[in-house]
């Protein structure tokens, strides 16, 4: 793929192994490209079929990508589908790493799930959004709070439960916040947790 752009069409990027790895879109194709600090392409790692996606996790020589309704593992420039949503309109939006485990959150039509893997190949469904509140539509985010040693998940759209936490890595969840405000991102700090707002007050709020 030829990148003749002043600003490459980068969907998202991560820093791994001292390099900038970016998910780049051109026409109807995606690719993972390695860039230098000036955002000049050094090499292309792999080309993928799709028009939207995210780099969810990067560690050593493995990349975990969300492309359409699939989780794709890229290793040694080879790609494989490791998980697929039960609904074609859904996608995997965020991931968080806790020691040797990676947790991924699904977004889209109800119900959506949180999945976990230790090797990025075999995935186990931990919980569905409707297991935690039958009126919820989907999860918005999952992150690990290193200060409080707990997983934090935001979700909603149709219910008053907006934030949940788990102290046993996703098997048992409790509400952290119920109310009108709906969030996407959660950033844990030592003495507080900062939440990024959703687009507005959703139904149920």
Protein language model annotation of sequence segments:
Residues 7-17, 48-60, 87-97, 135-141, ...:
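Repeated scaffold domains used in trafficking and secretory/extracellular systems
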Residues 35-42, 76-80, 115-125, 165-174:
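Asp-box/BNR beta-propeller loop motif
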Residues 104-119, 123-164, 175:
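Solenoidal tandem-repeat scaffolds enriched in leucines and small polar residues
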Residues 19-21, 61-64, 100-104, 148-152, ...:
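Entry beta-strands of beta-propeller and related beta-repeat scaffolds
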Residues 152-156, 160-164, 173-205:
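Beta-sheet-dominated scaffold domains
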Residues 21-42:
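Beta-propeller domains
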Residues 79-98, 125-131:
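Asp-box/WD-like beta-propeller blade repeats and closely related beta-sheet repeat scaffolds
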Residues 28-33, 69-73, 110-116, 159-165, ...:
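Structural motif
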């Amino acid at each position: 793929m030829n990148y003749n752009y002043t600003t490459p069409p980068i969907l998202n990027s991560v820093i791994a192994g001292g390099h900038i790895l970016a998910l780049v879109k051109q026409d109807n194709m995606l690719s993972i490209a390695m860039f230098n600090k000036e955002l000049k392409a050094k090499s292309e790692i792999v080309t993928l079929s799709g028009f939207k996606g995210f780099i969810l996790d990067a560690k050593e020589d493995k990349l975990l990508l969300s492309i359409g309704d699939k989780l794709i593992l890229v290793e040694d420039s080879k790609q494989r589908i490791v998980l697929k949503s039960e609904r074609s309109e859904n996608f995997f939006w965020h991931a968080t790493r806790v020691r040797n485990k990676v947790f991924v959150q699904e977004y889209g039509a109800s119900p959506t799930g949180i999945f976990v893997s230790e090797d990025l190949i075999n995935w186990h469904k931990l919980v569905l959004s409707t297991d935690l509140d039958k009126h919820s539509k989907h999860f918005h985010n999952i992150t690990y709070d290193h200060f409080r040693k707990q997983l934090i998940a935001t979700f909603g759209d149709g219910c008053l439960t907006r934030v949940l936490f788990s102290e046993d890595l996703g098997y048992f969840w409790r509400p952290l916040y119920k109310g009108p405000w709906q969030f996407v991102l959660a950033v844990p700090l030592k003495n507080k947790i900062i939440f990024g707002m959703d687009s507005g007050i959703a139904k149920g709020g």
